[in-house]
């Protein structure tokens, strides 16, 4: 399947070259692509309209990164491989996943995102997290946590806002009980006990190199 992603003497095709650069430039892109790929892999009840929306989301995500889905499909050689049968959304997503693995993506981040995506699908939660305003809110939170190293108390307030809108990710844990295990100590945002999975997610997905978050059992 991947014979087409290298052209002329092992030089990456335009889609592969663009994707490689975009992944290096932005950690967000891997997270966004992982959500799409894992939604496809775990979406047992996906309908035709769902596949259409996944493909459109993939196109928009790549466009924001400056890449064209058509170029990546061409690099993968899917059209030559499938010919008159036609290239489905599933073919594209499976091909993209194999390409990402060839590009040596961070498997730890990818698997963490997959676990969360599956949980969201199981709880009918995924469509909510893809809402435009919530995506922006999450990106703003990433900036505050990872780049600015913002006020931990304000970050806790932001987390509450997100989780109030996404109770489906809590796995039955009450919001009040969860936040009893999230606190600030010596300027460090700490996650303990039942809040540990949330802290792990923030570190693995939002900012793996962050220094102002502490997670313990």
From Swiss-Prot:
It is found in: Secreted. It comes from Leptodactylus vastus. Mass spectrometry data suggest sequence microheterogeneity hinting at the existence of several isoforms. Signal peptide: none annotated. Disulfide bonds join 18-67, 38-114, 125-168, 146-207. This is Ranaspumin. The lineage of its organism: Eukaryota, Metazoa, Chordata, Craniata, Vertebrata. Keywords: Disulfide bond, Secreted. The keyword Transport does not apply. GO terms for cellular component: extracellular region. Exclusively expressed in females in the early oviduct, the glandular part of the oviduct (pars convoluta dilata) and in the cloaca. Acts as a surfactant. Is the major protein constituent (45%) of foam nests. Has no antimicrobial activity, no larvicidal activity, and is not toxic to mice. Stable between 25 and 95 degrees Celsius. It comes from the Eukaryota. Monomer.
